[in-house]
């Protein structure tokens, strides 16, 4: 855990057990298929597809699975599903705002599974717009520190549209408008700086501080939501102090 700044609203990482790993593989493969359908099957001409393939490889998804998903999405191979993106929103315990990104081929199933996970874990689904106004989609790029200074990174990306460079301990995090994400990545490559991760994320303008027990309730809710194959990402507006993070690290 890199500190409460990273935990404020970012996606909650899953435990790397076999069941979770299998679900994570399925979601990464789904993203490849959708990216290929939207922008074509050539990664060199489709930055989103290129990103999704890199993420899948980093997570050790087998190359055969990656290639089949790319072909299904581009139409080179039959069998692709009609994936539809849906965003659900609502509140968890302690008034925490929750955004749930889904990618599904069955709207009714997705809605039922999300509603069940929320209601069983102290949450409630809200109307469209009930919490999304608290979040802003933000481009996020992370680079490993190594010998780099914050100024090194800032100089490399400032003219590409970067807004901030934050020190998260082992990595520097660069924020930008989602539309500037590719330009920021290109600027880093030109400067010889290796990219650790890049994505668009939701960041909250209003944060809810929680104690350890409150955090555990939210983590249980997030885990229940992410157990659904249709749920891609879950975002919250919690913020955790260093003391709470230290207490949580003692949990098994």
From Swiss-Prot:
Pfam families: TACO1_YebC_N (PF20772), Transcrip_reg (PF01709)
Keyword hit for DNA-binding: yes
Compartment(s) where it occurs, according to its Swiss-Prot or TrEMBL record: Cytoplasm
Region: Disordered, residue numbers: 1-22
GO molecular function terms attached to this record: DNA binding
GO biological process: regulation of DNA-templated transcription
Annotated GO CC locations: cytosol
InterPro entries (UniProt xref): Integrase-like_N, TACO1_YebC-like_2nd/3rd_dom, TACO1_YebC_N, Transcrip_reg_TACO1-like, Transcrip_reg_TACO1-like_dom3, YebC-like
Key words, A-Z: Cytoplasm, DNA-binding, Transcription, Transcription regulation
HAMAP family named in the record: Transcrip_reg_TACO1
Family to which the UniProt record says this protein belongs: Belongs to the TACO1 family.
Protein name listed in UniProt: Probable transcriptional regulatory protein CE1776
């Amino acid at each position: 855990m890199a500190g409460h700044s990273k935990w404020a609203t970012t996606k909650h990482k899953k435990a790397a057990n076999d069941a979770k790993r299998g679900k994570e593989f399925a979601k990464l493969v789904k993203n490849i298929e959708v990216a290929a359908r939207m922008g074509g099957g050539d990664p060199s001409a489709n930055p989103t597809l290129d990103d999704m393939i890199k993420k899948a490889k980093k997570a050790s998804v087998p190359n055969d699975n990656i290639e089949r998903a790319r072909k299904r999405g581009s139409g080179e191979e039959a069998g692709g599903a009609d994936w539809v993106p849906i965003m659900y929103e609502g509140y968890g315990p302690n008034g925490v705002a929750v955004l749930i990104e889904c990618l599904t081929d069955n709207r009714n199933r997705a809605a039922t599974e999300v509603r069940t996970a929320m209601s069983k874990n102290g949450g409630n689904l809200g109307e469209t717009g009930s919490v999304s106004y608290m979040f802003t989609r933000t481009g996020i790029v992370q680079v490993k520190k190594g010998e780099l200074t914050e100024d090194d990174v800032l100089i490399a990306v400032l003219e590409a549209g970067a807004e901030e460079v934050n020190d998260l301990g082992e990595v520097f995090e660069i924020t930008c408008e989602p539309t500037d994400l590719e330009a920021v990545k290109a600027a880093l490559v030109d400067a010889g700086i290796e990219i650790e991760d890049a994505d668009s994320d939701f960041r909250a303008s209003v944060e809810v501080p929680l104690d350890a027990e409150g955090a555990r309730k939210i983590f249980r809710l997030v885990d229940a939501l992410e157990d659904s194959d249709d749920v891609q990402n879950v975002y919250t507006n919690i913020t955790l102090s260093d003391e709470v993070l230290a207490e949580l690290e003692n949990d098994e």
